[in-house]
């Protein structure tokens, strides 16, 4: 195991929020103020460190006992920065992985940022037919319905009958992002439902949300990701492509990523640990990357509102990008088909991301089960112990 523990200070904006009365704008004095008293004439004790050793051991034990995975790694953050990074097996901190559905939270972040841009004409509650230059049977659905899996458009359960909708999983240069979107909007799928009536995870609805955003902004999807997340957060690797047509062509480097011209919105992103850590921090800092606010607190909160659990058919607690835990209140996660998963504990103020780079899907549920049943409870106990 290779492990590194780093604690970064709060950004100046967050120090301002924490020190409202004192102020952060300077005061014309060159004197360094004395640290605040702890009530007994001394200075405050240093903030206790969280002990990640039990979580590290659980990851190592998992790797030792599972014949499928050669490596696993994870990072934990809070509002102040990266708290802990650990790598196991053949992983390093620079390992780049395909995220599959762990792309969903960053995809929604991009949509929400576009919706909050005063210079853009995009509304997550506006029917997509009012934006797209073509009409179709699903024109009355909204982006909010699309990325909460409540649009009524059949999800991945109907993949076998997707037919022309499979264009969304191709890296063929002849298939354009917008042209595929027109197919998705205009070709009805079997077992379609009214918007807002059923929870049906994944698939064409997510691609339509991305196409609508691109058309509204007159930009490619990756241009939007770079504008609203990549540049302000200083992301080095994170981007979207589309490897689903042939996963074997991925060699673990960003240069091998195909399908950037027809990116898969729900499951096409790649990342390293550091980039995803920065994205998770946005959810803990009130929407900030460093000193730049990329999302409002309201947008962050809206992503966690249960939309999937309030429909009439097949209800499942789900926000926009986040699965909402039934058994662990205040916990949200975004697992992917290969085993990677991101998660957040709203009450305790931490979030994490676990990277997997085995794409056989032989035992892809195992890392997600590990995180949900062992790792998150261990981290919660560690944070609680540090707070006592």
Model-predicted regions and their roles:
Residues 114-158, 211, 215-259:
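Active-site helix/loop module of the DD-peptidase/beta-lactamase fold
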């Amino acid at each position: 195991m290779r492990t590194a523990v780093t604690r970064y200070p709060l950004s100046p904006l967050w120090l301002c929020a924490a020190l409202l009365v004192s102020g952060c704008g300077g005061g014309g004095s060159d004197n360094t103020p004395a640290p605040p008293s702890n009530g007994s004439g001394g200075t405050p004790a240093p903030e206790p460190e969280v002990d990640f050793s039990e979580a590290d051991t659980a990851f190592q034990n998992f790797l030792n006992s599972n014949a499928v995975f050669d490596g696993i790694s994870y990072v934990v953050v809070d509002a102040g920065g990266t708290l802990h990074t650990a790598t196991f097996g053949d992983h390093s901190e620079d390992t780049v992985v395909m995220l599959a559905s762990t792309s969903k939270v960053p995809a929604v972040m991009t949509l929400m940022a576009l919706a909050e841009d005063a210079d853009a004409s995009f509304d997550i509650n506006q029917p997509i037919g009012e934006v797209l230059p073509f009409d179709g049977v699903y024109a009355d659905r909204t982006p909010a319905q699309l990325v909460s899996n409540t649009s009524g458009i059949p999800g991945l359960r109907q993949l076998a009958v997707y037919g022309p909708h499979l264009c969304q999983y191709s890296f063929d240069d002849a298939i354009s992002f917008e042209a595929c979107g027109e197919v998705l909007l205009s070709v009805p799928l079997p077992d379609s439902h009214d918007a807002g009536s059923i929870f049906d995870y994944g698939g064409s609805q997510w691609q339509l949300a991305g196409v609508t955003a691109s058309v509204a902004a007159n930009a490619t999807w990756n241009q939007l990701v770079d504008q609203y997340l990549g540049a302000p957060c200083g992301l080095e690797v994170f981007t979207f492509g589309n490897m689903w047509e042939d996963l074997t062509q991925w060699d673990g480097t960003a240069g091998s990523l195909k399908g950037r011209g027809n990116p898969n919105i729900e499951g096409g992103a790649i990342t390293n640990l550091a980039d995803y850590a920065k994205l998770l921090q946005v959810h803990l800092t009130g929407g900030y990357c460093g000193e730049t606010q990329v999302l409002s607190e309201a947008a962050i909160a809206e992503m966690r509102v249960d939309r999937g659990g309030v429909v009439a058919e097949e209800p499942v607690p789900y926000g926009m990008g986040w699965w909402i835990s039934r058994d662990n209140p205040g916990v949200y996660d975004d697992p992917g088909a290969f085993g990677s998963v991101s998660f957040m504990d709203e009450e305790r103020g931490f979030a994490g991301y676990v990277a997997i780079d085995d794409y056989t899907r032989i035992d892809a549920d195992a890392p997600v089960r590990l995180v949900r049943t062992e790792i998150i409870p261990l981290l919660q106990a560690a944070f609680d112990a540090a707070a006592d």
